[in-house]
């Protein structure tokens, strides 16, 4: 399957994302996504556009005050607030271009505090041409990218034994969901799981009970991936067991950007620890599944 293109635009004025033309072309006609690129959430201004039309800004104190926009203190600022979160509903904003609210936001981004960022952009609309976004931002040197796909196989991989009805595991019968989660992290990191005496990097080994798989396949897809594409992949994995297979289960793990200003839904993304936010599907050959969701230590729990 194809994962579709995404785009990189260098030095794009933030004002371009609130114009009536952009909102009508992309936000109202499909799912539009944008995320500032190469910005650190703990020290830089960061921006994300969500598919529901919400524009989320994480701004340092000086920038926030210069824009004059209304927001709220970051919940991770500590005693002295040095970061603010601004949420702008583009759907509501574009409903009346003559309103004081639209004029104020437009003035803030265009004249009072013009902000420019390097953006990752993606747009999903059934039947739409992929070149629409390329032509729209042609004046900014837009680049089209495809997600990078890497395939690898591991022979004789020791894997945890799982049973769909035993989420918490059972001694000598099945491993727990938590044990699987740790094991997946080691596999994705290409860690040596043999726990040999000479291995000083990691003493981790596969949880018990386990079984040896003659050949395990790992496919890694890296890029600005849309949820719509991930759903298609998940459906294909579910159909993997339409015919009998030797494999008892397969997994699909999705990791978000560490420096995104939002994590689950519209929750603010914490930046004081690792910045993790990810989810993992485990699909069993009997069509049962597990869904695991994780965030950093300081973030709100997923819904």
Curated annotation (Swiss-Prot):
Top-level division of the source organism's lineage: Eukaryota
Keyword Coiled coil attributed: no
Keyword DNA-binding: no
One GO location term (cellular component): nucleolus
One Pfam family it belongs to: Ribonuc_P_40
An MF annotation (GO) of this entry: ribonuclease P activity
Cell compartments where the protein resides: Nucleus, Nucleolus
InterPro entries: RNase_P_Rpp40
Keyword list, A-Z: Nucleus, rRNA processing, tRNA processing
GO terms, biological process: endonucleolytic cleavage in ITS1 to separate SSU-rRNA from 5.8S rRNA and LSU-rRNA from tricistronic rRNA transcript (SSU-rRNA, 5.8S rRNA, LSU-rRNA); tRNA 5'-leader removal
UniProt xrefs under PANTHER family: RIBONUCLEASE P PROTEIN SUBUNIT P40
Subunit field text: Component of nuclear RNase P and RNase MRP ribonucleoproteins. RNase P consists of a catalytic RNA moiety and about 10 protein subunits; POP1, POP4, POP5, POP7, RPP14, RPP21, RPP25, RPP30, RPP38 and RPP40. Within the RNase P complex, POP1, POP7 and RPP25 form the 'finger' subcomplex, POP5, RPP14, RPP40 and homodimeric RPP30 form the 'palm' subcomplex, and RPP21, POP4 and RPP38 form the 'wrist' subcomplex. All subunits of the RNase P complex interact with the catalytic RNA. Several subunits of RNase P are also part of the RNase MRP complex.
Functional note: Component of ribonuclease P, a ribonucleoprotein complex that generates mature tRNA molecules by cleaving their 5'-ends. Also a component of the MRP ribonuclease complex, which cleaves pre-rRNA sequences.
Name recorded for this polypeptide: Ribonuclease P protein subunit p40
Originating organism: Bos taurus (Bovine)
């Amino acid at each position: 399957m194809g994962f579709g293109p995404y785009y990189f635009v260098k030095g794009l004025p933030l004002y371009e994302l609130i114009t009536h033309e952009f909102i009508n072309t992309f936000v109202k006609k499909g799912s539009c996504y944008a995320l500032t690129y190469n910005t650190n959430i703990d020290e830089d201004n960061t921006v994300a556009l969500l598919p529901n039309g919400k524009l989320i800004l994480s701004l340092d104190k000086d920038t926030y005050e210069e824009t004059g926009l209304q927001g709220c203190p970051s919940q991770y600022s500590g005693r002295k607030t040095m970061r603010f979160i601004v949420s702008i509903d583009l759907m509501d904003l574009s409903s009346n271009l003559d309103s004081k609210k639209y004029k104020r936001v437009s003035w803030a981004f265009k004249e009072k505090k013009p902000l420019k960022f390097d953006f990752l952009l993606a747009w999903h609309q059934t039947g739409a041409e992929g070149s629409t976004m390329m032509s729209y931002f042609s004046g900014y040197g837009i680049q089209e990218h495809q997600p990078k796909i890497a395939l690898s196989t591991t022979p004789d991989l020791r894997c945890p034994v799982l049973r769909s009805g035993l989420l918490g595991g059972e001694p000598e019968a099945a491993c727990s969901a938590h044990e699987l989660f740790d094991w997946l992290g080691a596999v994705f990191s290409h860690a040596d799981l043999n726990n040999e005496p000479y291995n000083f990097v990691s003493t981790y080994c596969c949880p018990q009970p386990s079984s040896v798989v003659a050949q395990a396949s790992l496919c890694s897809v890296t890029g600005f991936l849309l949820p719509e594409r991930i759903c298609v992949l998940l459906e294909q994995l579910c159909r993997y067991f339409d015919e009998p297979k030797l494999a008892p289960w397969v997994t699909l793990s999705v990791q978000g950007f560490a420096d995104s200003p939002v994590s689950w839904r519209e929750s603010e993304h914490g930046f004081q620890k690792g910045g993790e936010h990810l989810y993992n599907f485990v699909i069993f050959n009997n069509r049962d599944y597990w869904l695991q969701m994780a965030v950093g230590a300081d973030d709100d729990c997923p819904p």
